[in-house]
Amino acid sequence: MNQNWNAEKYTSDFSFVHNYGNDVLGLIDTTGVKDVLDLGCGNGALTNTLADKGFSVVGMDASEEMLEIARNNYPGISFIRSDAVDFALEKPVDVVFSNAVFHWIDKADQPRMLECVYRALKSGGQFVFEMGGIGNNILIHSALADLFREYGYTYKMPFYFPSVGEYAGMLEAVGFQVRFAVLFDRPTKLKGENGLSDWINMFV
């Protein structure tokens, strides 16, 4: 993945990330679902919501700083450290859930990650996730690229924002059947007069 996290600031100032993820939880078909993996669980907020719904849930993240917060806040939940592009479960699960994670993973690593997810699921299991898509924050990244160029530097885009068609093709190549996928606008109001600079410092 592309990011070293300030886990405490992320938790205190950017709660909108996991708050938006609550809507994604509603896409899970709960019929017969028992075991859930929250892939890229971060501070564990949505992992806890899944547990509150009665699922047996495990949170997985590559950031030890994030996992420390998750374990402190939700000691009754199992959290394990592993990279999304190279993980394996002892037993497959009914659902792999993920919120606001996959756009952090380089395009070249996406197929390997999706293969890990596919192997982690029981036959007929569900893969329910949200990620940034094509055009996301394009004005910010264009402005940063112009600014870097003005000073003689090249701006390296830190995210992978695919189209629905591109990503559906990746999923199908691994073996998934895509039942529902949508690209939508989601304006986010940032906090305070330094909201944009704080966002850039955290995520870029």
Place the predicted regions along the sequence by residue.
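A short SAM/SAH-binding and catalytic strip from SAM-dependent methyltransferases
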Residues: 95-109
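Conserved class I S-adenosyl-L-methionine
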Residues: 1-34, 45, 49, 128-150
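Class I SAM-dependent methyltransferase SAM/SAH-binding core
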Residues: 37-39, 43-86
